[in-house]
Amino acid sequence: MENQEKPLVIAYYLPQFHPFKENDEWWGKGFTEWTNVGKAKPLFRGHYQPKVPADLGYYDLRLPEIRQQQAELAKEAGVSGFCYWHYWFGEGRQLLNEIIDEVVATGKPDFPFCLGWANETWKAKQWNKDGSGDKVLIEQRYGGEDDYRHHFEYV
């Protein structure tokens, strides 16, 4: 038992905490996941909502210093690496790739990571309070062998 390795702790990393063009078009200028966080309502006694972010506040992931601080906090908490959600909708169409592209290009933060492919169609009902509205925002497509190769080469 003394030579057993510790398990890797990987934190999922949602890259939607910054404005981007498509969210502005679909939900209004300046919409980010922070908009949804701020709308949270308590559902039962003792359920404190909305949760106000602690250490880094309402951060913007476009700022390299924020990503560095996140990596430092993760290390302090015993996290081994991040799993960045990766949005490849087929035929070369991506969303939210700027953050991971910058991490790869700069090597910062210097923190282990992997990608998790969030391969699903985005529909408006995912964000509508009542779950209504099947409006497709962006469709997940599987474009065949050339597209698969292109995606593989990207990652």
Name each model feature, range by range.
Residues M1-V155:
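Glycan-processing catalytic domains of CAZymes
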